[in-house]
Amino acid sequence: MEVNILAFIAIVLFISVPTAFLLIIYVKTVSESN
């Protein structure tokens, strides 16, 4: 169970961090466009 939980956390971080980074860039681009 512990390994599965750690793997789940690692996957969530691996997906959420780049997504948040791209989202921030997108918001900045839209703000500059407007």
Curated annotation (Swiss-Prot):
Topological type in the membrane: Single-pass membrane protein
Assigned keywords, A-Z: Chloroplast, Membrane, Photosynthesis, Photosystem II, Plastid, Reaction center, Thylakoid, Transmembrane, Transmembrane helix
Cellular compartments per GO CC: chloroplast thylakoid membrane; photosystem II
Keyword Thylakoid among record annotations: yes
Gene Ontology terms: biological process: photosynthesis, light reaction
Pfam families according to UniProt: PsbM (PF05151)
Subcellular location: Plastid, Chloroplast thylakoid membrane
Keyword Acyltransferase appears in the UniProt entry: no
Major localisation: plastid
Transmembrane regions: 5-25
Matches recorded under InterPro entries: PSII_PsbM (IPR007826), PSII_PsbM_sf (IPR037269)
HAMAP family according to UniProt: PSII_PsbM
Family: Belongs to the PsbM family.
Known partners and oligomeric status: PSII is composed of 1 copy each of membrane proteins PsbA, PsbB, PsbC, PsbD, PsbE, PsbF, PsbH, PsbI, PsbJ, PsbK, PsbL, PsbM, PsbT, PsbX, PsbY, PsbZ, Psb30/Ycf12, at least 3 peripheral proteins of the oxygen-evolving complex and a large number of cofactors. It forms dimeric complexes.
Summary of the function given for this chain in its UniProt record: One of the components of the core complex of photosystem II (PSII). PSII is a light-driven water:plastoquinone oxidoreductase that uses light energy to abstract electrons from H(2)O, generating O(2) and a proton gradient subsequently used for ATP formation. It consists of a core antenna complex that captures photons, and an electron transfer chain that converts photonic excitation into a charge separation. This subunit is found at the monomer-monomer interface.
NCBIfam families per UniProt: PS_II_psbM
Protein name in UniProt: Photosystem II reaction center protein M
Lineage, highest ranks first: Eukaryota, Viridiplantae, Streptophyta, Embryophyta, Tracheophyta
